[in-house]
């Protein structure tokens, strides 16, 4: 019986890992469709390379930092319980690799390639798993203190804070240290529009992410006996709420329309196992509003050139999601209970503080040591030709 359960659980979490692996194609196409044509190849290569670096670093360092588990044992030992511990690593790796994928969208079109891979190694090896261990493995006694003080631990079922807010708040200092793209803002304060280069690819990326997100959220149960359809229903409602509010506030702009469902899904991750579907709908709708309002404000008023809006989308909507779990997760508002708003507030603030400080240190050190921005000539030429020596489409065909 145990063998059947182990096999079923291993398959369950493996399918989740594969769905989230596919989400990285979504990250790539969302960025490809948003950046200008001369930076499309770079978007594709960067996401793939970041995932490969994340895999190696998380295998040797990050997973041990978060969970105290290493894989330096014989294959026979590793294969026990149908290899469940191995596919659990694969599943959690796909979460860790989302950190550089999120950052990539913010620093697009002007960041150096190799320094970003170095940043990925440090962030996935140390910064991300440090907070992951606190939130999901009880490190430093923070969860025990919150439970003793406020009656419940910090609850983040699928990573509104641990993954999305951390990624978004690491990206913010990276974007600020890089500075705006060449020609984005004039000395007089005027804003030069850089519209998406390919709306169909942007939409494709958003759809891939949206579909994969149901693996991201539902499979966070990690075993079949803990799986609950409430998570899927709440994810669906948050997606719908985020879409409609972003569509309305964005005045039918397709960029806002297709980021709306992502905003809702980011926010519902933390409390998707606790909320009533109506609470999830409200959480997603508010997230859609946060994204549209803050994206416009950061770009036009504060002159922060966050290309894909990853700080509003992941950083702020993720922060809202951590807090929303402590609101709509309460039994008084139709939730399942077992959550404290104060624990959610303190846990969320701790997560974004660790992320922001870690981001400043990592990108600040790289900027001082080797530089993190392309030369003006390279930026003007585009990252595709400057870094990869090829464009996304041939300028001309050669016939013999």
Residue ranges and their predicted role:
Residues 1-400:
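Hydrophobic alpha-helical transmembrane bundles of multi-pass membrane proteins
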């Amino acid at each position: 019986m145990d063998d059947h359960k182990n096999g079923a659980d291993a398959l369950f979490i493996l399918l989740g890992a594969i769905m989230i692996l596919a989400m990285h194609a979504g990250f790539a196409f969302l960025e490809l469709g948003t950046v200008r044509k001369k930076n499309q190849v770079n978007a594709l290569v960067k996401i793939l390379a970041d995932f490969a670096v994340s895999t190696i670093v998380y295998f040797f360092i990050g997973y041990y930092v978060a969970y105290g588990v290493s894989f330096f044992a014989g294959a026979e030992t590793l294969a026990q319980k149908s290899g469940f511990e191995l596919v659990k690593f694969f599943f959690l790796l796909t979460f860790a690799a989302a950190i550089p994928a999120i950052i990539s969208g913010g620093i697009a079109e002007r960041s150096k390639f190799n320094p970003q891979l170095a940043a990925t190694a440090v962030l996935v090896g140390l910064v991300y798993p440090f907070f992951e261990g606190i939130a999901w493995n009880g490190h430093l006694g923070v969860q025990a203190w919150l439970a003793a003080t406020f009656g419940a631990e910090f609850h983040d079922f699928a990573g509104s804070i641990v993954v999305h807010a951390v990624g978004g708040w690491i990206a913010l200092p990276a974007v600020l240290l890089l500075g705006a793209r060449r020609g984005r803002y004039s000395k007089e304060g005027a804003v030069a529009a850089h519209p998406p280069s390919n709306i169909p690819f942007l939409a494709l990326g958003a759809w891939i992410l949206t579909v994969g997100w149901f693996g991201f959220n539902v499979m966070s149960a990690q075993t079949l006996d803990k799986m609950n359809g409430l998570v899927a229903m709440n994810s669906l409602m948050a997606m719908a709420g985020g879409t409609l509010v972003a569509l309305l506030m964005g005045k039918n702009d397709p960029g806002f329309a297709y980021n709306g469902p992502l905003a809702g899904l980011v926010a519902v991750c933390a409390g998707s196992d606790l909320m009533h579907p109506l609470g999830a709908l409200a959480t997603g709708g508010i997230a859609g509003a946060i994204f549209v309002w803050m994206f416009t404000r950061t770009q036009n008023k504060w002159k922060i050139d966050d290309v894909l809006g990853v700080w509003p989308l992941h950083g702020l909507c993720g922060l809202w999601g951590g807090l929303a779990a402590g609101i709509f997760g309460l039994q008084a508002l139709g939730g399942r209970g077992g959550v404290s708003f104060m624990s959610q507030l303190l846990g969320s603030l701790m997560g974004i503080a660790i992320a922001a400080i870690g981001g400043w240190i990592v990108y600040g050190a790289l900027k001082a040591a080797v530089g993190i921005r392309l030369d003006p000539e390279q930026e003007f030429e585009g990252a595709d030709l400057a870094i990869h020596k090829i464009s996304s489409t041939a300028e001309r065909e050669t016939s013999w």
